[in-house]
Curated annotation (Swiss-Prot):
Keywords: Cell membrane, Disulfide bond, Glycoprotein, Hydrolase, Membrane, Protease, Secreted, Serine protease, Signal-anchor, Transmembrane, Transmembrane helix, Zymogen
Descriptive protein name: Transmembrane protease serine 11E
Gene coding for it: TMPRSS11E
Function statement: Serine protease which possesses both gelatinolytic and caseinolytic activities. Shows a preference for Arg in the P1 position.
Extracellular side: 41-423
InterPro entries (UniProt xref): Pept_S1A_HAT/DESC1 (IPR017329), Peptidase_S1_PA (IPR009003), Peptidase_S1_PA_chymotrypsin (IPR043504), Peptidase_S1A (IPR001314), SEA_dom (IPR000082), SEA_dom_sf (IPR036364), Trypsin_dom (IPR001254), TRYPSIN_HIS (IPR018114)
Topological domain ranges for the Cytoplasmic compartment: 1-19
Start and end residues of each Peptidase S1 domain: 192-422
Organism: Homo sapiens (Human)
Description of how the protein assembles with itself and partners: Forms a heterodimer with SERPINA5 and SERPINE1.
């Protein structure tokens, strides 16, 4: 059989007339121009600009100023939440519902006939809007809609004043408030043992305590000059001159460093017992508050965190039992466990005292580990303000079933902190 290749037939070449080619190009250019025009129109009319305002509002209340004038107290939080809700409702009942982002009380000050609330107000308007017109509309909405606000407290709508501020000023005000942090959606985090690294500004109160330059424990910034940590961190290493505190999401390089002026260990702490496991460290000089470094809120002694509350523990500790500390800060989402469950025989068999709390998972999924000691266990309130609930203290290895992490209960020792620091 002879090999027979396929017959390839020549195709007739089709040539377009020049006017057809020109028409196709012309139509293509028109379509491209329309697409570009629509894109520019969309960007121009849909891009939004953030407007930040410093606002003041007068009000009267039956409560004494001393009851809510102290930042982060239960009464401060309650009063702030009421006023923020009033402002939110004012915008939600106006045509500016979609433009309103948030309001936040940053402090209160006394007046001769009442109290002045100092607030930050954040809105977003289309970039094509006239800035002066925006300012007038925001002021008008507050004046008109706050007249319908139902107290207590009783607000004076005509007292509202707003002043436009830039992002740097806004950040500065927020950074000087306790318990604020970078806005970030908190998904399900794994334990610090193999957990997730965090970004700058997520947990700005976290500190690393280092002895002769080596990380030993975590700590929490509670004001510009004081850290709170665990007492057992200083059992062997007592000389403050050899300790340093670093801040930021990495130990090396750090965002900033400070030496320690003095260390205060609770008088009732007796090693190797875990009870009263709390200490304070005074920094050699104050730290400036920034987006990356600022303080957590301390809860009132009377505040009660509830079993089942979702909390976060952070630290530079090991990824496994008897492992090495990490250079990058990690986080773990844990759940508060009631003391009765934690004191059961299969758990800690009545070893949990009123100065302790348990958090984690009875299945052993989440936990802190070596090197996390002294670090923060924090919980947020309805205003998304974060409070120090516990201090990493002890546990049976790391992430073992029925052996959740044990933390020093901050509310139980809140008065001791005040007695030593005035905070």
């Amino acid at each position: 059989m002879m090999y027979r290749p396929d017959v390839v037939r020549a195709r007739k070449r089709v040539c377009w007339e020049p006017w057809v080619i020109g028409l196709v190009i012309f139509i293509s250019l028109i379509v491209l121009a329309v697409c570009i025009g629509l894109t520019v129109h969309y960007v121009r009319y849909n891009q939004k600009k953030t407007y930040n305002y410093y606002s003041t509002l007068s009000f009267t209340t039956d409560k004494l100023y001393a009851e809510f004038g102290r930042e982060a107290s239960n009464n401060f939080t309650e009063m702030s939440q009421r006023l923020e809700s009033m402002v939110k409702n004012a915008f939600y009942k106006s045509p500016l519902r979609e433009e309103f982002v948030k309001s936040q009380v940053i402090k209160f000050s006394q007046q001769k006939h009442g109290v002045l609330a100092h607030m930050l107000l954040i809105c977003r308007f289309h970039s094509t809007e006239d800035p002066e017109t925006v300012d007038k509309i925001v002021q008008l909405v507050l004046h008109e809609k706050l007249q319908d606000a139902v107290g207590p407290p009783k607000v004076d709508p005509h007292s509202v004043k707003i002043k436009k501020i830039n992002k740097t000023e806004t950040d500065s005000y927020l950074n000087h408030c306790c318990g604020t942090r970078r806005s970030k959606t908190l998904g399900q985090s794994l334990r610090i043992v193999g957990g997730t690294e965090v970004e700058e500004g997520e947990w700005p109160w976290q500190a690393s305590l280092q002895w002769d330059g080596s990380h030993r424990c975590g700590a929490t910034l509670i004001n510009a000059t004081w850290l709170v940590s665990a007492a057992h961190c200083f059992t062997t290493y007592k000389n403050p001159a050899r300790w340093t505190a670093s801040f930021g999401v990495t130990i090396k390089p750090s965002k900033m460093k400070r030496g320690l002026r003095r260390i205060i260990v609770h008088e009732k702490y007796k090693h190797p017992s875990h009870d009263y496991d709390i200490s304070l460290a005074e920094l050699s000089s104050p730290v400036p508050y920034t987006n990356a470094v600022h303080r957590v809120c301390l809860p009132d002694a009377s505040y009660e965190f509830q079993p089942g509350d979702v909390m976060f523990v952070t630290g530079f500790g090991a990824l496994k039992n008897d492992g090495y500390s990490q250079n990058h800060l990690r986080q773990a989402q844990v759940t508060l466990i009631d003391a009765t469950t934690c004191n059961e025989p299969q758990a800690y068999n009545d070893a949990i005292t009123p100065r302790m709390l348990c958090a984690g998972s009875l299945e052993g999924k989440t936990d802190a580990c070596q090197g996390d000691s002294g670090g923060p266990l924090v919980s947020s309130d309805a205003r998304d303000i974060w409070y120090l609930a516990g201090i990493v203290s002890w546990g049976d290895e790391c992430a073992k079933p029925n052996k959740p992490g044990v933390y020093t209960r901050v509310t139980a020792l809140r008065d001791w902190i005040t007695s030593k620091t005035g905070i």
